[in-house]
Each structure stands twice: as structure tokens, then as C-alpha cells.
Curated annotation (Swiss-Prot):
Top EC class of this enzyme: lyase
Name assigned to this protein: Alpha-enolase
Main subcellular localisation: cytoplasm
Residue numbers bearing the N6-malonyllysine modification: 233, 420
N6-succinyllysine: residues bearing it: 60, 89, 228, 420
Origin species: Macaca fascicularis (Crab-eating macaque)
Binding site for substrate: 158, 167, 293, 318, 370-373, 394
Length: 434
């Protein structure tokens, strides 16, 4: 079925910033998609087009991206009469029309909005659930429910506290199914709230952009200690492991790292990549840390390679790879990490997201699907993670509706699959392994 009409508009994300929403019409109805936006963005990401008109929304308006859809992309898609099931053809057409390496003409936010809406329409056109359509596009015969990685303590660029490292996550790998993983996550979260309240006072339980708590602590180890205590109090020590997103590019300073980067600058406290690696190794030794994302700066390739070779855990590339095939290929060759973080808006289309995922999986890497800190109520990534069988997703704490929207959609998918539902569990790094 071909596209009858495409209409884009400015809506608001969970931080009150404008973002792009796209309505796509076929004879089967209306399909709507909204685009997320990140706070700590890698310098190699596809370009998110903002208006930069300081008199409006602090320069963060997206009226230009919206206009590119309504005036240029929409007429082209309608006139070409392409079937909405032809995801790759449609994405390719938009990328060719844009003609730039990083989608800077139309904006990745424009192309992605249309791409997501096309994918939703394609599923209905085929008469299958979205996750099944995505699995078909990726060439997967089965679908898998992921382990959720709940970001329950926020630091870094996501929070106003002194904590340098951005995310402290709990992964309920010992759960029997996704519903139980949600219950464990929620119970640990509520226990954590009480632990923080008792230790630091009620105002320390205010939440950050992704629904996690942001107590004003400086020591990253203290974040891990709080998690360990909460997991124990909830009674899940044997079922929950810990993941971190350090987002080290945010505190990289001339070849070294500043673990107190939110205070006035003082080069005497900077530490070397080796010292930082030793700190991570002490975390791995003392706590059930099984995954660390962006442990070093996006261009500190040597430090990545050294750490991945010796750490023995999942090392996730986000700012390092930005889901870009060239960066992934380099990271594969240099053995810089062993897991890809997949954010659809880093690369800017469904087709390229699928390709990045397949490239990583083909090289024996894990893949973690991810939200952005500026989110909407759109639930596309819930279906994406199931269809791509990556086995792991991070989409915030079990708090704030834009985060729960994704987790609740995963609950619905598990229910719909019934006895056919498979949960990644402890095999979250390679859920398709026989």
C-alpha cells in the first residue's frame, strides 16, 4: 500500500524541548512516530537539525526539520507510490535526497521520523505486529524479550549532582520472564529510594532525566554501594547484576580524565586512562558489575582496546561507535569493545539501525538497544529490541511515563506471544546462542 499523505509537526520531548513527530497515512489508517533526542551526544552522530533561532525555544526549535518533511520529503514519497513495506527503498530514497554524509541537509530527526512511521505502517500493511515486521526486515526467524537495564542512579550530564559517571543500572538477569524482571526492577527501585532517603534525606530522592535518583554524592563507588544495599534489601542478590554507563567523553580533559568535572577546573586531580581502568577493575572485583558503557573518551582507542582485552566483562561502545558502520568496523578490527549500543537517532533511519545491529552481531558482539535522555511516549524501540533479538534494552528507571511507555509495551508483547515468549535472562549478551 502506498503512502497517501505525510505530515510532520513540532511536539515536546520529556525535557520540554521541541522534537519531530510524523503522521503518515495509508489506506489502512494513520501511523505516528516521534523522534527522541540525547543530552550527551557523540561527536560522530548523525546531525539532529535544530533551528538555532535564539528567540525561539532557546534555539532548539525543529521547524526547519519539520518543513523539510512537509515540503520536500512528503511530496517525493507520495509521488513515488512506494509500498510502505519497502523500508530499505524508502530510507535509501530519503538518504539520497539528503545527499550528505551525516544527514545534515534534512536532519537525522526528519529522516528518522518518517522512517519510523513507515516501519509502523509496513507492519499493519503486512498484518503482523511491529516486532514481527522488524524481525522479518532483519532476517530473524525468532523474537526474544530483553533483559531491562534500569538506570536507577543518575550522574554525569544527566544530573545536577557531583557524580561523574552517568548511569548506574540494575539488570534482573535471574528473572524467569520479562514480567518478573519488571517486578524485580520496581522493587529494587523502591528499596533504593528508601536507602537514599535514610542516608541523604528526602530531597536526595528527586529524579533525573531518566527517572533515576540523583543523590549528591561524589564517589562513584558510593553509587555501586547504594545499589548493592538496595538489591540485598529487596532480596534479589542472586538475581540482579549491575551495569554502568560512564560517558567518559564528558569528563575527558587533554588525554586524562576528571572525576570531579562539575567542580571548578583543577588539572592536578586528573587521572590517566590506566588509573581509570584500574578503578573499573576494582568495581568489577567488589560489585556484580557485568557491563560498562563508554569507559573512555570516543577517540581514546588505545585505552578501549587494552581494557576490553583484560576486563572480562561486556564493554559497550556508544559515543565510540554511534551506530556508524565505519566506526563499528574500526572498533571490530581494533577489538575496542564487544557490544554495540543501538540508538536509532544516532544513525537516523530504521534500515541503517538494522544494518548496524547485524554488523555487530555478525562479529560476535552483543547489542543493547537504547532510549535517549530526551524521550517521548513513542514505543518503537520496545518492538525493535524484540525483533532484533538483542536480549538487552536500556530505557530508564521504572519511573516517568516516557520510560514506562517502552517497558509496558514489552509487557504487552510478552503477553501476546504467550507460551512462545522467550526471555533472554542470563544469556542477555548472546541470546541466540544455542
Amino acid at each position: 500500500m502506498s503512502i497517501l499523505k505525510v505530515h510532520a509537526r513540532e511536539i515536546f520531548d520529556s525535557r520540554g524541548n521541541p522534537t519531530v513527530e510524523v503522521d503518515l497515512f495509508t489506506s489502512k489508517g494513520l501511523f505516528r512516530a516521534a523522534v527522541p533526542s540525547g543530552a550527551s551526544t557523540g561527536i560522530y552522530e548523525a546531525l539532529e537539525l535544530r533551528d538555532n533561532d535564539k528567540t525561539r525555544y532557546m534555539g532548539k526549535g525543529v521547524s526547519k526539520a519539520v518543513e523539510h518533511i512537509n515540503k520536500t520529503i512528503a511530496p517525493a514519497l507520495v509521488s513515488k507510490k512506494l509500498n510502505v513495506t519497502e523500508q530499505e527503498k524508502i530510507d535509501k530514497l530519503m538518504i539520497e535526497m539528503d545527499g550528505t554524509e551525516n544527514k545534515s541537509k534534512f536532519g537525522a530527526n526528519a529522516i528518522l521520523g518518517v522512517s519510523l512511521a513507515v516501519c509502523k505502517a509496513g507492519a499493519v500493511e503486512k498484518g503482523v505486529p511491529l516486532y514481527r515486521h522488524i524481525a522479518d526486515l532483519a532476517g530473524n526467524s525468532e523474537v526474544i524479550l530483553p533483559v531491562p537495564a534500569f538506570n536507577v542512579i543518575n550522574g554525569g550530564s544527566h544530573a545536577g549532582n557531583k557524580l561523574a559517571m552517568q548511569e548506574f543500572m540494575i539488570l534482573p538477569v535471574g528473572a524467569a520472564n520479562f514480567r518478573e524482571a519488571m517486578r524485580i526492577g520496581a522493587e529494587v527501585y523502591h528499596n533504593l529510594k528508601n536507602v537514599i532517603k535514610e542516608k541523604y534525606g528526602k530531597d536526595a530522592t528527586n529524579v533525573g532525566d531518566e527517572g533515576g535518583f540523583a543523590p549528591n554524592i561524589l564517589e562513584n563507588k558510593e553509587g555501586l554501594e547504594l545499589l548493592k544495599t538496595a538489591i540485598g534489601k529487596a532480596g534479589y542478590t542472586d538475581k540482579v547484576v549491575i551495569g554502568m554507563d560512564v560517558a567518559a567523553s564528558e569528563f575527558f580533559r587533554s588525554g586524562k580524565y576528571d572525576l570531579d568535572f562539575k567542580s571548578p577546573d583543577d588539572p592536578s586531580r586528573y587521572i590517566s586512562p590506566d588509573q581509570l581502568a584500574d578503578l573499573y577493575k576494582s568495581f568489577i572485583k567488589d560489585y556484580p558489575v557485568v557491563s560498562i558503557e563508554d569507559p573512555f573518551d570516543q577517540d581514546d582507542w588505545g585505552a578501549w582496546q587494552k581494557f576490553t582485552a583484560s576486563a572480562g566483562i561486556q564493554v559497550v561502545g556508544d559515543d565510540l561507535t554511534v551506530a556508524n558502520p565505519k566506526r563499528i568496523a574500526k572498533a571490530v578490527n581494533e577489538k575496542s569493545c564487544n557490544c554495540l549500543l543501538l540508538k536509532v537517532n544516532q544513525i537516523g533511519s530504521v534500515t541503517e539501525s538494522l544494518q548496524a545491529c547485524k554488523l555487530a552481531q555478525a562479529n560476535g558482539w552483543g547489542v543493547m538497544v537504547s532510549h535517549r535522555s530526551g524521550e517521548t511516549e513513542d514505543t518503537f524501540i520496545a518492538d525493535l529490541v524484540v525483533g532484533l533479538c538483542t536480549g538487552q534494552i536500556k530505557t530508564g528507571a521504572p519511573c516517568r511515563s516516557e520510560r514506562l511507555a517502552k517497558y509496558n509495551q514489552l509487557l504487552r508483547i510478552e503477553e501476546e506471544l504467550g507460551s512462545k515468549a522467550k526471555f533472554a535472562g542470563r544469556n542477555f549478551r548472546n541470546p541466540l546462542a544455542k
